[in-house]
Amino acid sequence: MTYLILLGASICLFPFWEVTMLTLAFIIPMSLTYLNINFTFSFSSELIWLTPIGTALIFLTLMVTLLVLIGTYNIKNYKYIGCLSSLNLVLMMAFCVCDFLTFYVMFEVSLIPTLLLILLWGYQPERMQAGFYLMLYTVTASLPLLLLLLYLYYTVGSLNFYIIMVYYSFNNNPLMLVGLMMAFLVKLPIYTCHLWLPKAHVEAPLGGSMVLAGVLLKLGGYGLYMLINFIISKSSSLVISVIITLSLWGAVIASIICIQQVDIKALVAYSSVAHMSLVSAGILMMSNWSYTCAKMTMIAHGYTSSALFVLANLSYLKIKSRSLMFMKGLLAIFPAMAFYWFLFSCMNMAAPPTLNFIGELLIIPSMYIASYMLLILMCIIMFISAGYSLYMYMTVNHGELGLYITPSIQLKNVDYHVLTAHLLPTFILLIPQLFSV
């Protein structure tokens, strides 16, 4: 893994499209060797620390970065490549560090390349407001986490994961619980902390939306998972129950908002809020089943949401509008693209036999054990999720052909390759050891 990080760092030194593509093509097969590992936690060195979910997220990061470069092959600006490469390196390091302070630094540094992608390659003047919302929400929410990490260091003398788990006894302080978790709940995000996400997605370029939805949101899920396992660990505080309930009700509300959207990118962004709320609820339930559900949902959502933004961009290039009022009848002209719309809409609604389906199915026993009311909420979420996914597919591809469609040719082969590359991992990554607890 150390070699992978060094190779990732070398990309930042030579931010050229060809060099970056060759390096990623070499790193990704190497990262595959870390996926089928039969351990729960393992140290690789004093600084590098691997877990099954961490290695899966590293593979996801590398894959999404590669697909961003292929999907935006017409942008070969060295500044753009440098932003993506540095973000790729920071995320790889975040998913394999062994202490909370280094993770916090990587967590915050990842905002800089993301902000640059939105500000420099966004489409509209509103990108300034989107960047402001991104920094305001994430930085403000992470300040209590920094203060509490300094308190932990003063108390324990180290911020290493295992040392904190052994020597620190959490006292169920409600304010401390909220302060520790707030940064990750905003990053996921859960409903009520989500306003920055639709704005960032709508104003970001294709590459920014793919990385943001595919990987950056998982940084919040990974941080929450580590926090629960090593600091909070089996807490029975009322705050946990309140956040679980808020997450599920937020997922219901976000799903309803999806049906009301007219902007295709905003619809996909709100669907991310709904799915990541399930991730936060699964992690906070602190059972083996719910942990497995959260991990599977994170990985599956990474590929699905990234592909949906690719499809939204391809449809935008044909219509020159993101409005669902104008984006109609594409099946008659672009049947192959409509086929991919159907596949990824099914994955977004968690239809079998995809990883999305297994992830959402496994959370049902945990919901039932916790409370039958939570199970009812989960069923409502799954029902509405199917509704807005079908609504999105039917609106874009069926009906009378829109009057504003521009004359254009069929999709290029590279577009099909990008979409297929998003599709395959959700079937290939059904490895039991990958999601072990």
Swiss-Prot record:
Annotated membrane topology: Multi-pass membrane protein
What reaction(s) does this enzyme catalyze?
Answer: a ubiquinone + NADH + 5 H(+)(in) = a ubiquinol + NAD(+) + 4 H(+)(out)
Q: What class of enzyme is it?
A: translocase
Gene Ontology CC annotation, any one: mitochondrial membrane
Q: Which GO terms describe its molecular function?
A: NADH dehydrogenase (ubiquinone) activity; ubiquinone binding
Broad class of where this protein is predominantly found: mitochondrion
Q: Which organism does this record belong to?
A: Albinaria caerulea (Land snail)
Membrane-spanning residues: 8-28, 50-70, 78-98, 100-120, 132-152, 177-197, 212-232, 239-259, 266-286, 297-317, 324-344, 361-381, 417-437
The job of this chain, per UniProt, is described as: Core subunit of the mitochondrial membrane respiratory chain NADH dehydrogenase (Complex I) that is believed to belong to the minimal assembly required for catalysis. Complex I functions in the transfer of electrons from NADH to the respiratory chain. The immediate electron acceptor for the enzyme is believed to be ubiquinone.
Q: What EC numbers are recorded for this enzyme? A: 7.1.1.2
Keyword entries, A-Z: Electron transport, Membrane, Mitochondrion, NAD, Respiratory chain, Translocase, Transmembrane, Transmembrane helix, Transport, Ubiquinone
Tell me the Gene Ontology biological-process terms attached to this UniProt entry: ATP synthesis coupled electron transport; electron transport coupled proton transport
**Keyword hit for Coiled coil:** no
Q: InterPro entries attached here?
A: NADH_UbQ_OxRdtase, ND/Mrp_TM
* Pfam assignment, any one: Proton_antipo_M
The yes or no answer to whether the keyword Transmembrane is present is yes
Protein name per the record: NADH-ubiquinone oxidoreductase chain 4
What family is reported? Belongs to the complex I subunit 4 family.
Q: Which gene encodes it?
A: ND4
Give its localization.
Mitochondrion membrane
